[in-house]
């Protein structure tokens, strides 16, 4: 879907595919980048640092720099899959392969002993006039910046009911990818407006004004991937005049 040239920040890539029954990604380390495997339906065996648990979609598991991961589909059905990669060095990818497909893991932890991301809509909370938009959005930050060691800043989940909107705003220090999890709606980036639906992905570069509107029916559910120019630096300016900040700049004490 995207590669290291798609954004100005350190996105490595975003891949989207199916994992067929008996398929997966073998066990490997990353030392200069971070990844997160996500499944959107079914279930799969996720491994982080040699410990394996079964997760059911929609869920993901971040793998930080210096750690290892794998995924295996032991079920009889294909699983919808995404892999997000963010690098420490722009354009640089690394992987140290352990030659272990993780296809016959006998001992699985019923409760994962690694970090996970759950995109269950029941976890969302109402936010009226989100970014000065119309109606009441449902929003949550699924993963914050301190989960990661790179400039990966967050994963947000946003549900816009029919005709509700995420108001016009921009970021000076953050780029985003909006991925449509469910439903349909309208996206505007700068002066371009397009209809979007499940499976679409919209990149938003630095300083680009953007807004979204939920369509009829079930509205518009989005996963938002945020990557900063520097670790822990995040900002939001509200439109249309961008005369003020919704949130002050935040700088990590550990950056």
Question: Where on the chain are the PLM-derived regions?
Answer:
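A short, N-terminal "cap"/entry segment at the start of jelly-roll beta-barrel domains
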Residues: 1-11, 92-152, 167, 236-255
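Conserved short histidine dyad/triad with adjacent acidic residue
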Residues: 2, 15-30, 139-143, 156-171
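Glycine- and acidic-residue-biased ligand/ion/polar-headgroup-sensing regions
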Residues: 32-44, 173-185, 190
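Structural motif
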Residues: 43-45, 52, 68, 78, ...
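Short acidic-glycine-tyrosine-enriched beta hairpin
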Residues: 50-65, 191-206
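A short hydrophobic beta-strand segment most commonly corresponding to one strand
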Residues: 62, 77-93, 203, 218-235
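Asparagine-centered strand-capping/turn motif at beta-strand->loop junctions
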Residues: 71-75, 212-216
